[in-house]
């Protein structure tokens, strides 16, 4: 997709962070917007940022873990705009817990949003993207979809799942030659609210970690501004890239994993232990 003018983009998690910046930058390029988020106040803030651009915008309060709600939203988008060209499955949450301490409730919570939300969004919009004749799906994984880390088993699992799902989807779309493509995004630490909304289990104390300190450390890792991330994503869509790594941290982690696919886990354990002793 060479340009976004007069295209229609559906974005989940559009009330803050990367989703909000995608909306702003697409509006600047003349893209009509179907924005959704579970946070209505955040959506209102995003609308305030894009309202002066000559594009149509709809706002929908949406829980991406609700399949019917996502399907209804996709239908409404097609009815409102007559077409959908871009889908950004961006909504996500974080969770820190040991495997032993991970509750089934928390595991289902994070999978329902991070993985099933992506599946629902992809499947609900795919027929409309094909109808448009020129479509693109962008699914947000993570650098934790490239490597695993202690206390991140559930989060890792969801992001590895998004990666596998999207890479398989891209191959199928290539074989179909249907005019629709897909990109998997692996952001490093992006300066968003994900750390503040993350669930922190006391079980990580068994590894010598303090939940409050872990949350502060997580926040310090968030270096890349969301507008920079959004720019990289849109550039990747225009170039039809299969995968995009965002941030120096994601690029370094990816390189280390390629060089030593199993050895990196020992290094990660060492670094985690070193941090907890500080």
Give, region by region, the residue ranges found by the protein language model:
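Residue(s) in the substrate-gating loop at a strand-loop-helix junction
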Residues: 142
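The beta1-alpha1 cofactor-binding region of Rossmann-like NAD(H)/NADP(H)-dependent oxidoreductases
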Residues: 40-41, 61-72, 104
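Active-site helix of classical SDR
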Residues: 122, 158
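Substrate-binding pocket helix/loop in short-chain dehydrogenase/reductase
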Residues: 98-99, 103-109
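SDR active-site lid
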Residues: 174-244, 248
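Conserved glycine-rich Rossmann-like NAD(P)H-binding loop of the short-chain dehydrogenase/reductase
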Residues: 29-45
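Conserved glycine-rich cofactor-binding loop
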Residues: 8, 15-17
């Amino acid at each position: 997709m060479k340009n976004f003018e007069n295209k229609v983009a559906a974005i989940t998690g559009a009330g803050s962070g990367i989703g909000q910046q995608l909306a702003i930058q697409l509006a600047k390029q003349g893209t009509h917007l179907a924005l959704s988020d579970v946070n209505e106040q955040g959506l209102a803030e995003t609308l305030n940022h894009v309202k002066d651009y000559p594009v149509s915008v709809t706002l929908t309060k949406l829980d991406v873990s609700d399949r019917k709600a996502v399907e209804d939203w996709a239908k409404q988008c097609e009815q409102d705009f007559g077409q959908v060209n871009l889908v950004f499955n961006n909504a996500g949450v974080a969770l820190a817990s040991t495997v032993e301490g991970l509750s089934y409730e928390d595991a289902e919570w994070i999978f329902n949003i991070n993985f099933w939300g992506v599946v629902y969004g992809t499947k609900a919009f795919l027929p409309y993207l094909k109808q448009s004749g020129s479509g693109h799906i962008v699914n947000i994984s993570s650098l934790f979809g490239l490597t695993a880390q202690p206390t991140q088993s559930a989060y890792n699992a969801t992001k590895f799942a998004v990666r596998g799902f999207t890479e398989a989807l891209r191959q199928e779309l290539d074989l179909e030659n249907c005019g629709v493509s897909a990109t998997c995004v692996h952001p490093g630490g992006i300066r968003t609210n994900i750390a503040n909304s993350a669930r922190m289990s006391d079980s990580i104390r068994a590894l010598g970690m303090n939940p409050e300190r872990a949350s502060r450390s997580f926040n310090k890792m968030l270096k890349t501004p969301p507008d920079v991330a959004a720019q990289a994503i849109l550039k990747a869509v225009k170039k039809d890239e299969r995968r995009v790594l965002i941030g120096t941290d994601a690029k370094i982690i990816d390189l280390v994993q390629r060089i030593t696919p199993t050895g990196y886990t020992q290094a990660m354990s060492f670094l985690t232990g070193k941090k907890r002793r500080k």
